[in-house]
Design a protein with these regions (language model features):
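Short, isolated positions in well-ordered beta-strands
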Residues: 14-16
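Residue-level signal for threonine
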Residues: 19
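Short, hydrophobic/amphipathic alpha-helical patches that form generic packing surfaces
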Residues: 43-54, 79-86
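Short acidic/polar mixed-charge low-complexity motifs
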Residues: 10-12
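Charged interaction scaffolds used for protein-protein
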Residues: 1-8, 23, 31-38, 58-117
Length: 117
């Protein structure tokens, strides 16, 4: 989750980014990666608004819509938002650093054992 978008609109600076909670909020609003890939035009405004959740949660939807309508190079914007979401999903599989305090786990086979005579 390294990629961020910095923008200024009407002299107000914004830092758009995602974290796991903002993506969960997006998913609760109906977002899915598969639908975004299939129908980006139907989902881009939701994805753009979702990027405000982490740092600018109280920004009104009307302001977000206005910012989106005034943003140039929307193709690059969509690519960057998709990358940011991908990074957030990938972070689920990040391995913890070091060994101290990490949870240990193993697979236990509980299927019945059969004996052969």
């Amino acid at each position: 989750m390294n990629t961020k978008i910095k923008l200024t609109y009407k002299d107000v600076p914004y830092v758009l980014e995602y974290d796991r909670m903002s993506v969960k909020t997006l998913e609760a609003s109906g977002f899915s990666v598969e639908e975004f890939v299939k129908k980006p035009m139907s989902n881009i405004e939701l994805v753009f608004a979702g990027a405000f959740i982490k740092n600018h949660r109280k920004t009104k939807q009307t302001v977000i819509d206005e910012i989106f309508s005034k943003t140039k190079d929307k193709e690059k914007l969509v690519e960057t938002l998709a990358l940011m979401i991908e990074e957030t999903y990938s972070s689920l599989f990040d391995e913890p650093e070091g060994d101290e305090g990490n949870a240990e786990w193993e697979v236990v086979d509980l299927s019945p054992k059969t004996s052969h005579k």
